[in-house]
Amino acid sequence: MRSKYLKYLNEDIKFDKETMIGIFCLLVVITGMFGFIYEFIFYYFNGGMKTFYWRGGNFLPWINIYATGSIMIYLLTYKDRKKPLKVFLVSVITTGILEYFSGLGMDKIAGKRCWDYSQEILGALNINGYVCLRSVLVFGVFSLLLIYIVLPLIFYIAKKSNKKVFVTTSIIL
């Protein structure tokens, strides 16, 4: 297993367009659901959530911004995967920008404030309540998990699976 992991780090793994579509679809599902679970757990323990409410505004258990962020992180850091510090720093900056402009856009365009970090843990270091130090550091760690655990696993599944089955299943999910 270690040799396969080192191969992931050291070699550019090439997939055809159809398989890449399947990889991106699976990545969107996994990271969007992960974001939903993370936010549920965080807000349950942080705010003592008394009743369950559906975060993310979807009819399925995922949050779009996590899925969008994962695609951006993949596109911006995959070639630098041998440099974890660079992956982390690029991820922190990228997710901070994504979160800031997503929050600002929803606030200004839709008139809806979906999050406000001004009162959160480590919220003192925030930008207009849309982004805070805690959130971007957590997203940086999640990005490391994405690049070094989730993507190698998805690539492994894509390589070992029948292409048609993998792509179809990924798209259906």
List each model region and its residues.
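Aromatic-rich, lipid-facing transmembrane alpha helices and their immediate juxtamembrane interface loops
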Residues: 1-173
